[in-house]
């Protein structure tokens, strides 16, 4: 894997999870997001993309290099 650039994602929670279904709240928890304004950097993997798609209306996603 030397020389391969791994795409990273910066994920920011922009809306509260209050009133959301349990699976969407669980996706935020799996992404290590607890409060509005929290930001995490993650590798771009299918698992992370699945979490993002489950709660896409609650988060903002940026690609970083």
UniProtKB/Swiss-Prot annotation:
Keywords: Ribonucleoprotein, Ribosomal protein
Single GO biological process annotation from the record: translation
Listed CDD domains: Ribosomal_L30 (cd01658)
Molecular function GO terms recorded: structural constituent of ribosome
One CC-aspect GO term: large ribosomal subunit
Subunit field text: Part of the 50S ribosomal subunit.
Protein family (similarity comment): Belongs to the universal ribosomal protein uL30 family.
NCBIfam families from the UniProt entry: rpmD_bact
HAMAP family assigned to the protein according to its UniProt record, in alphabetical order: Ribosomal_uL30_B
Protein name (record): Large ribosomal subunit protein uL30
The organism's taxonomic lineage, starting at the top: Bacteria, Bacillati, Actinomycetota, Actinomycetes, Micrococcales
């Amino acid at each position: 894997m030397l020389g391969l650039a791994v795409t990273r994602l910066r994920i920011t929670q922009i809306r509260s999870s209050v009133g959301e279904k349990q699976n969407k709240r669980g996706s935020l928890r799996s992404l290590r997001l607890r409060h509005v304004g929290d930001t995490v950097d993650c590798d771009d993997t299918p698992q992370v993309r699945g979490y993002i798609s489950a709660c896409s209306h609650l988060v903002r996603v940026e690609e970083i290099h």
